[in-house]
Amino acid sequence: MTYENISPSEAKSRMDTNPEAVIVDVRRPDEFVTGHIPGAINVPLADIQDGNIPLCLADKNAVYLIYCRSGVRSVTAAVALEKMGYTHLANFGGILDWPYEIEH
């Protein structure tokens, strides 16, 4: 398995220590605009499943920190990206469990 499940606090630590890490929100755009983690990019799960991967996810060796609303879609996204050859994936669940800053 190339992806790992980590806690929100571990994700925050990785964001703070690795500015190169890409924070990926796999919720729908209408969910993303209601509030998201600062610096996150919105790549809906449906796009990933359809193979519509944006340029911001072009580097399969980059570090990706993935989340959704409750943690279900983020696991699905991590598995799909893993099958596409991505090597550094971390799922930290849902924004519902995120105790830190949220950007609106």
Please report, for each region that a protein language model flagged, where it lies by residue:
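Rhodanese-like catalytic fold shared by cysteine-dependent sulfurtransferases
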Residues: M1-A21, P29-V63, V72-H104
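Short, surface-exposed ligand- or partner-binding patches at beta-edge/loop junctions that are enriched
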Residues: Y67
